[in-house]
A protein has these predicted regions:
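Acidic, metal-coordinating catalytic segment for phosphate/diphosphate chemistry
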Residues: 1-28
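Local beta-strand/beta-hairpin segments that build beta-sheet-rich folds
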Residues: 6, 87-88
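Short connector loops at helix/strand junctions that flank enzyme active sites
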Residues: 24, 54, 85, 102-105
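Conserved beta-strand and immediately adjacent loop positions that scaffold enzyme active sites
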Residues: 28, 37, 129
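Conserved Nudix-box catalytic region and its N-terminal flanking loop in Nudix hydrolases
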Residues: 33-75, 79
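A short, polar/proline- and glycine-enriched secondary-structure boundary/capping micro-motif
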Residues: 50-54, 128-131, 152
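Unchanged
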Residues: 59-82, 90-146
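Charged phosphate-binding loop/patch that engages nucleotide di/tri-phosphates or the phosphate backbone
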Residues: 140-164
């Protein structure tokens, strides 16, 4: 005889395709100082690992992606900046315990206009540390392949502009 479960169905037991979809929009990017270094942050991933990444965060109501990039860079690194270029948008999916998330992250190049490197101003306390990294060393330091690609795309864009 076949046994059936009398308990409620939990989201964990559902196929991921059946989970509700949530869309998230974020912005951030590469913030450069006058020595061509980029400020990056360390934060804990969903699995608890410390990972080095670009500063970024959710777009708030009434904000443009550029305004979000400036705000998030300042909150997570202490560095004030201005957007100088658009780089690319990362589009990806991930599955949580109760939903599938479709996330778009807009990345910009920013130039430092002030501030000091610190994580003390991060209202969400997500950033554990912040450091300056030479732009050419980002590929060795950034944890996420998509963010390494952002740096590569910006380097390629700058090289093209220099050769025009």
């Amino acid at each position: 005889q076949r046994r059936t479960s009398d308990g409620p169905t939990t989201f964990a037991s559902l196929d991921a395709q059946e989970l509700p979809v949530v869309r998230e929009y974020s912005a951030g990017g590469l913030i450069f100082d006058d020595q061509n270094r980029v400020a990056i942050i360390a934060r804990h991933s969903r699995s608890g690992h410390l990972e080095w990444c670009l500063p970024k965060g959710h777009i708030e109501k009434g904000e443009t992606p550029q305004q979000t990039a400036v705000r998030e860079v300042h909150e997570e690194t202490g560095i004030l900046g201005e957007v100088i270029d658009s780089i690319a948008t990362i589009d990806y999916w991930f599955t949580g315990t109760t939903q599938r998330v479709h996330k778009l992250v807009h990345h910009y190049a920013l130039r430092q206009t002030g501030g000091e490197l610190t994580v003390e101003g991060d209202p969400d306390h997500e950033a554990e540390d912040a450091i300056w990294v030479r732009f050419d060393d980002l590929d060795d330091v950034l944890s996420y392949p998509n963010e390494r690609k952002i740096a590569w795309l910006y380097a390629r864009k700058k090289n093209r502009q220099a050769n025009e």
